[in-house]
């Protein structure tokens, strides 16, 4: 029987960045092979560092998918745990070690007896940085194993063990990375009329772009435009020839994201025209679309867990965090939900330490749900 605590701790010690999860891949493959050694209805495929495990049903009418992400973050761990990260400047600070462990536990349970419907377990790389779900889909990694329904979870620090949360609409925002460069003409600070100051243009842009959310976005729908980085100039007495800005757009629907992207571009173009500077702009939504739950499947999941002892199912509002599972849910109907892990530190914090007691709880409750779906 899989030791959930030991498995999680082993995975916690080897966090790796997206598409570099080589030790993680090897550990998962070894564990999966052990779990499936007596299973005659299982097949395994790999795609780079990703892994797909397919359980063939006895009389399949559909395929049910379960997804777990496997990558870590470029964070120096500060938990002080005996099993802290062995990789410098790398940490499982978003709970993906928990996601993998739960998926392995579910695989073990579901491989005990052949289900009626097919089951796919996806161990997906590069959630944090490269939208690995999109990469796998576009590369054809699923083939004829593409699920008819897809499910996935994310740990949530501010919920207690036993609490789960989701909704029947959008759970996470879609994100879009924004890169902007204004190019003017450098010169001596004493003679600004002989130059064209890119820093001034960029400063006006940062101010003007605030109107996009306040004047173009329905406040009931909501959106975020944040520029967290601006770099211009080299010293105090030289007028900046270039100014670079790096920001993010977040919205709860793809239509709203496209509207905000359009307005950010228009504001940047207007600033460039009015100041007579050149503009380069890159809007990159990549694979981080809004995580839009299928209403019927979400209602089924929420109703199911409402009737399960020991589970408190919460109907929660959406969050502006991003998740690349949104790309897969744009292709396949499904549901994502929060799983409470009761820790005072937020996701991506160097002290994040979820409660391990959630592991047997999650495997027990979620395996029953999967058995219901697969039979």
Curated annotation (Swiss-Prot):
Record-linked InterPro entries: AcetylDAP_deacetylase, Amidohydrolase, Bact_exopeptidase_dim_dom, Peptidase_M20, Peptidase_M20_dimer
Catalytic residues in the record: 69, 128
Domain of life: Bacteria
The protein's annotated pathway: Amino-acid biosynthesis; L-lysine biosynthesis via DAP pathway; LL-2,6-diaminopimelate from (S)-tetrahydrodipicolinate (acetylase route): step 3/3
Gene Ontology molecular function: N-acetyldiaminopimelate deacetylase activity
Alphabetical UniProt keywords: Amino-acid biosynthesis, Diaminopimelate biosynthesis, Hydrolase, Lysine biosynthesis
UniProt keyword Amino-acid biosynthesis present: yes
Keyword Hydrolase part of the UniProt annotation: yes
Catalyses which reaction(s): N-acetyl-(2S,6S)-2,6-diaminopimelate + H2O = (2S,6S)-2,6-diaminopimelate + acetate
EC number: 3.5.1.47
A biological process term (GO) from this entry: lysine biosynthetic process via diaminopimelate
Record NCBIfam families: amidohydrolases
HAMAP family the record matches: DapEL
Described purpose of this protein according to its UniProt entry: Catalyzes the conversion of N-acetyl-diaminopimelate to diaminopimelate and acetate.
Protein family per UniProt: Belongs to the peptidase M20A family. N-acetyldiaminopimelate deacetylase subfamily.
Record-given protein name: N-acetyldiaminopimelate deacetylase
Organism from which the protein derives: Streptococcus suis (strain 05ZYH33)
